[in-house]
Amino acid sequence: MNLGHWNFLLALISLQTFFNASAQISTVNNSSKGSNNSNIFHEDTFNSTSIDVLDASIHSTLVVPQTYSTEAATISGARFATSVPVQSPVDNPLDPADCSQREKYRKQPVATPSSRLRKCCPHGENLNIYRENQSDSMCDNGLLSFEPTIISAVLFDNCIEDLEVETTLDYDIGNPCNSSLLYDDKDDVFFVLQDGSLLIIDKFGNESYTVKEHYCLDIDKSGHLFAFTCVTQVEEQIAFAKVVFVAVLMLISMPCLLLVSYLHMTLRLLRNLHGLSLSLMSLCLASGYFVHSVVHIYGIPNQGFIGYVIQFCILSYFFWYLCICFNVLLNVWYKLPCCIQCSKSWATFNFACYAVFAFSGPATIVALTVQKGLPGMPSYFLQGLTESIRDSQRYFIPPVSTILFLSFLLNIISFFGFQRISGYAKAEKNIQERKCLFDQQKYEDVKKDAKCVSLLGIIMVVSWLLEIITFYSGSNSNYLILCDMVNGLQGVWVLLIFLVVRRRRTIILRWWYDRGSHEIEGTELQALSNSPT
């Protein structure tokens, strides 16, 4: 074989080697390009205006009950409100492209009728974060709208899949925590899941996420979103057995109040302006106690309409008491000194004014409560352990305290009115001729009514002070149940005060005797013969 053949053979071998190397390089390039097409994340998927989550591939570990944390997150095909650092596919080459290869998480967020989004401040108010460490906050009137992102998602072992279903949730108002941690949207992204729990995704660093069930979410006046998550869960406030016991006392008070209301509406001698006001006052308290006790005994949800009905009834009770105190003052300072004899039409007009005031006042307060999104349940059976519970009573405790204070002032003014008018009774014995005849019997009746009203006022003030002590006390001491017992027995106090006094007892016994069920003794007949008809 000559030299030319060898040269030809070497050329063929070199050409074959070149083609093989070119084929291998082409295969590697195609493989690399395909890998980049399936794993690369475009910058435009993380922009400042997007709000939906498509899916997330995340490594998950359980932290504490009802709290789940994930680390080493690889977010694929997701869009968030701000830029989130994306992990290179070279770092995690085995991560799947979606959640289909992941095991579904054992506990899933499920939307229920009771699912709520927890807002820190009432409607129309925003957070005011103050102090350097941002450890304290309060709610101020604000104009910024609160529109958090709500998603429906499925939790997998290392992945979150957005179902892209439009979801809406009602709001619960207030911070439910004894102590809390503060998150803000500078470092985290917040989403609310379909069951009302909060999904927190870390923008920077370890690319982790957390799900919290006990939290509240709101914005400050600059538009930044903040989340307060509970460090410790709220303890049970009052044992169920104690709640049932006090609720039973309320049910015992109810027939006493209904009896007072019925007798003052039925008996002609008791059916005057004072008696009708007392009747409606007792009826309002009986209605509130009945609904309140049934709700707690049977565990009926007290959010929404039922809570507002109870709030309206209890507030009406205090407003009617204020009307009764004002009626005593009106008699002492105007009707008795001026010898005013009220006609039936004037008494009807006077009662209508009382009714408008006693019902429109509570209705206005309930309307404000609804507007702010606060629960309407009164503070009975509650302890203000958290900010949300304390804030829920802003339209119950301050109004009732104000009404009782005004009633106390009216009773004091009425007392000085009695001191002033007592001179008329003494002067009547010495003066033979008077321009107008002073009604001594009416004076005695008003005086007895004033004594009963003042005694009831003392009981109401004492029971209300005990209620405030119970609400703001942070302990579960046994003496707190005694405070609630005094409140639960208010119907019994009303019965004893307004029906056991001698003149009313005599009138009731006479009414009973007319039906053949009682024999009136001589002293009672003598008292009746001296009383006006």
Curated annotation (Swiss-Prot):
GO annotation (BP), single: G protein-coupled receptor signaling pathway
Keyword Glycoprotein: yes
Superkingdom field: Eukaryota
N-terminal signal peptide: 1-23
Residues exposed to the Extracellular side: 24-242, 301-303, 369-395, 473-480
Gene Ontology terms, MF aspect: G protein-coupled receptor activity
Chain positions carrying an annotated carbohydrate: 20, 29-30, 36, 47, 133, 178, 206
Localization per record: Cell membrane
Stretches the record annotates as Disordered: 86-108
Disulfide links within the chain: 120-216
Entry GO CC: membrane; plasma membrane
UniProt topological domain (Cytoplasmic) ranges: 264-279, 325-347, 417-451, 502-533
This protein's record includes keyword Disulfide bond: yes
Protein keywords: Cell membrane, Disulfide bond, G-protein coupled receptor, Glycoprotein, Membrane, Receptor, Signal, Transducer, Transmembrane, Transmembrane helix
Gene3D superfamilies: Methuselah ectodomain, domain 2, Rhodopsin 7-helix transmembrane proteins
Family, per entry: Belongs to the G-protein coupled receptor 2 family. Mth subfamily.
PANTHER family on file: G-PROTEIN COUPLED RECEPTOR MTH-LIKE 1-RELATED, G-PROTEIN COUPLED RECEPTOR MTH-LIKE 14-RELATED
Name of the protein this chain belongs to: Probable G-protein coupled receptor Mth-like 14
Organism: Drosophila melanogaster (Fruit fly)
